[in-house]
């Protein structure tokens, strides 16, 4: 979900301009059978038209609060695309359950993650998605195909994502593993790469990365309504 002409709109997002419209969009999603809602709280790198647009707040706290309130009534979690400290702060204040991507954190934000009375379970988690951001800054434009504006925005955003992941880990916050599948160089099977990046850039030990992708992810998703046909999956394969 996004504001009109916001990040992801209209190609991959229902749009809303008021809290009332936001509630209607949530209801539409729930009727379609979704078990989680993602909102674009800030601008993003891939569709930014100006330097600084990525990470700039887009959706109002009031709209995000309406979305969270409506979704939480049905036990549905809400994740927020947020790529700046202010975007993260506003999202947490509204009651989102996860922050996707993230930014540099301070003591206030760390405290809001740890104790978030507006979130479904009283706390919020960070999902850094390093594998979505790092290729944009580590590889050349001939490989990524991004514009000069997108490159400058990615430099600003990705550094914050990496710093935030490391800070959250040091603070003992709940950190899940996600990849933002569909981004450049992020295929469906790339979860293993995210584990490597958490170890290389965010200070995780290999065991901590495995714990995040299994136990922590399970905790984050624990309240999601299960479909009639539910199959559990674990990314670990043990060879004996």
Please name every model-derived segment:
Residues 1-17, 139-150, 154:
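Acidic/polar short surface loop at catalytic or gating sites that assists cofactor/ion binding
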Residues 5-25, 56, 73-82:
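Active-site mouth loops of central-metabolism enzymes
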Residues 19-35, 105-125, 165-167:
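Short amphipathic alpha-helices and their capping/turn segments at secondary-structure boundaries
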Residues 21-24, 63, 208:
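An acidic, carboxylate-rich microenvironment
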Residues 40-159, 176, 181-183, 202-204, ...:
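Active-site core of metal-dependent hydrolases
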Residues 73, 146-148, 158-240:
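His/Asp/Glu-enriched, well-ordered alpha-helical/loop segment
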């Amino acid at each position: 979900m996004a504001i009109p002409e916001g990040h992801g709109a209209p190609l991959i997002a229902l749009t809303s301009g008021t809290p009332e419209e936001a509630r209607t969009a949530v209801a539409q999603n729930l009727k379609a059978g979704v078990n989680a809602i993602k909102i674009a709280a800030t601008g993003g790198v891939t569709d930014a038209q100006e330097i600084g647009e990525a990470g700039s707040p887009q959706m109002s706290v009031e709209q995000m609060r309406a979305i969270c309130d409506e979704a939480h009534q049905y036990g549905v979690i809400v994740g927020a695309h947020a790529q700046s400290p202010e975007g993260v702060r506003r999202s947490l204040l509204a009651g989102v359950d996860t922050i996707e991507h993230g930014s540099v954190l301070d003591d206030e934000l760390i405290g809001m993650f740890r104790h978030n009375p507006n979130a479904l379970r009283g706390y919020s988690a960070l999902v850094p998605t390093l594998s979505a951001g790092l290729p944009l800054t580590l590889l050349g434009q001939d490989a990524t195909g991004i514009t000069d504006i997108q490159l400058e925005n990615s430099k600003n955003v990705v550094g914050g994502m990496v710093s935030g992941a490391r800070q959250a880990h040091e603070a003992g916050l709940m950190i899940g593993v996600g990849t933002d599948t569909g981004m450049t160089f992020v295929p469906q099977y790339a979860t293993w790469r995210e584990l490597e990046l958490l170890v290389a850039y965010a200070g995780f030990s290999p065991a901590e990365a495995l714990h995040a992708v299994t136990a922590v992810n399970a905790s984050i998703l624990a309240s999601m309504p299960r479909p009639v046909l539910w199959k559990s999956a674990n990314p670990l394969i043990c060879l004996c």
